[in-house]
Amino acid sequence: MIKRLIDNLNYTFREFLIVSSVILLITLIVIKQSEFKSIDIFKGKQLHQGGYYIGKILKTPKNIFDSTIKTEFKNLNKVIEDNNLIKNGYPFIIYTSKTNEFIQYIAAIPINNCEKIKQPAKYVCNYFPKQDVLTVIHKGFLQDRNKGWEILENEIAKNEKKLLNAPFEVFWKGIEQSKDSTTWLTGLYYPIK
């Protein structure tokens, strides 16, 4: 009987060790992920090549902007499929105006050309011009990209640059390519003269 108690005690202790180890491992992973900080790298002046795009003109409250944009890119992909168009780059947003409450913008995806497209209401097919831009590469969480925009605004003020066109951002790598948000890449651009 004592042997059986010792065997049960050992079995329970082993279970305790296994469960404790798993909990410790999960805790370490969560702490490590919470330590990640998004990175913004100023790249200076670059040439953005431009090209044709199909997009939708939108005005969204700031507090639901990030969730709305995911839906709008899905809708744009459907329009591209329905019109048998070929994507020619990464999805992007052209910011036409911002207030404290709303963001007005064009959610867009590059395509080869704008011929023979059945455009639903509020959709546009246009050419985005080749232009000089100040660039910041944002790596990490999308909700942290405001620091990148601040870097661009400070550079414009410091160097007395003039905006030539609406600012825009390109989503190079996002949730569609990787669930690991620490690897997401977004290009932030201010067109300049």
Predicted features along the sequence, with ranges:
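A solvent-exposed interaction/effector surface
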Residues: 2-193
